[in-house]
Amino acid sequence: MNNRKIIQALVFFFLSLLLSIFLANLVIPKASSKLTAEDSTKVEQPSLYYLAVGDSLTEGVGDTTGQGGFATLLANSFTNEFGYQVTYRNFGISGNTSSQIFKRMKEDSDLAEALKDADVMTLTVGGNDLRKVILKNFTNLDVSTFDKPATEYGKRLEKIIRRAREKNPNLPIYVIGIYNPFYLNFPELTDMQLVVDKWNQETESRTRKFSGVYFVPINDLLYKGLEGEQGVSVNTSKIANNLLYGEDSFHPNNTG
């Protein structure tokens, strides 16, 4: 298996388990080395430049362990599980919308250099765009309210991808889908899952326009919680999700 396929498989694996208790660095057994000390000095460790770009999920908000969320765990796993010598840069900023991420990609010289050097990139985007629409139209929300904003978001996502490819034409990009924590903050929005599904469909359809750009869905893992129970119900008086950060009921916690 070549490096590209290994990287692709590993990214999908860890991001799919992003919000479950089966963190790979705890459950994947590590085979004991059969190399002698002399042999190990002869093995050149392959290098990998991992770039994480996005919003609070990339920054690691909600991870009370202080490790930095899924991106840091993924970077560590490249080393621990596959022996890569990893260069890891994290450009996640909490609250960033797609417009703000694109602006940073144009204006941040450090990010521009990181894009040129990266071997693989993850992107978390879209959740704050959706939240902005909810807050702006809160008194008059309908599923159709999100149609135009979703399309506009999709166009901005394409601009982000094109910007990354301008700097690095063959860069594999993994775009993480959004999930539905809104039933905890806005339990009256019972159609919110339909909106989140549509938002993810928009993201996935845009990624399919590019070779080497992949959509990674995470909604089912987060929306249903640790026990796999549906998050939205008629009785919204007591709703909880043990994969979300208790302080805001929005971001994944360290288990998530």
Label the predicted regions.
Residues 8-25:
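Hydrophobic membrane-insertion alpha-helices, especially the h-region
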Residues 28-92, 112-113:
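Serine-esterase "nucleophile elbow" of acetyl-processing enzymes
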Residues 49-52, 87-92, 119-124, 172-177, ...:
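Structural recognition of the beta-strand scaffold that forms the well-ordered cores
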Residues 93-99, 130, 137-152, 184-192:
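Surface-exposed cleft-lining segments at the edges of enzyme active sites
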Residues 103-148:
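Oxyanion-hole/transition-state-stabilizing segment in secreted/luminal serine hydrolases
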Residues 127, 131-140, 227-243:
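Short, flexible, mixed-charge acidic loops at enzyme active sites
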Residues 181-220:
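Substrate-gating cap/lid alpha-helix
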Residues 240-256:
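Histidine-centered active-site loop/cap adjacent to the catalytic His
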